């Protein structure tokens, strides 16, 4: 029981669950307003991390991005028996791809905040799947981001990552309203 309380306390500190006095815990609400603020913060931090990674990254970093993109593009997006549910192998490969993009960033605080924002956005990403499958080419979005980053084109990379994130936000917001 102590381990469960500790886990719930940690999830509460991360904003994923809400503690209710004398009533236990509930999963934090999702809302278009929360998603818009989260996306705004995430885009700003992600772009800063990308800028630093592009400035500092070398051949190993580029190789890691190409490998992560290859892995992601060869991983099933949704569950074979339920196309409305993300395949957890894809979720892991997606996380690794986005981590690889910024892995050459040398500011650990920016990376830490980026990781927290990524984790927060995951629950919204899960919501986007049944709403958007036909109207978006996520694989092409990832290729565009990787191409811009490896080309060291900061403006194009920042625009591509922002578009990628705001597209998810738009899809979820439409579904929530």
Task: Describe every region a protein language model picked out.
Residues 17, 135-136:
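Short secondary-structure boundary/capping segments
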């Amino acid at each position: 029981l102590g381990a469960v309380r500790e886990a719930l306390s940690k999830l509460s500190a991360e904003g994923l669950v809400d503690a209710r006095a004398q009533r236990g815990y509930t999963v934090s609400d999702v809302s278009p307003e929360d998603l818009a603020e989260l996306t705004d913060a995430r885009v700003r931090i992600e772009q800063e991390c990308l800028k630093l990674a592009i400035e500092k990254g070398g051949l190993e970093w580029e190789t890691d991005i190409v490998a992560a993109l290859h892995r992601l593009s060869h991983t099933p997006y949704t569950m074979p028996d339920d196309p409305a549910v993300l395949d957890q192998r894809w979720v892991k490969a997606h996380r690794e791809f986005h981590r690889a993009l910024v892995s050459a960033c040398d500011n650990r605080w920016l990376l830490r905040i980026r990781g927290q924002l990524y984790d927060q956005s995951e629950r919204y990403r899960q919501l986007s799947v049944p709403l958007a499958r036909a109207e978006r080419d996520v694989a092409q979005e990832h290729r565009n981001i990787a191409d811009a980053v490896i080309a060291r084109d900061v403006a194009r990379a920042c625009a591509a990552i922002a578009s990628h994130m705001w597209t998810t936000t738009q899809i979820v917001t439409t579904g929530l309203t």
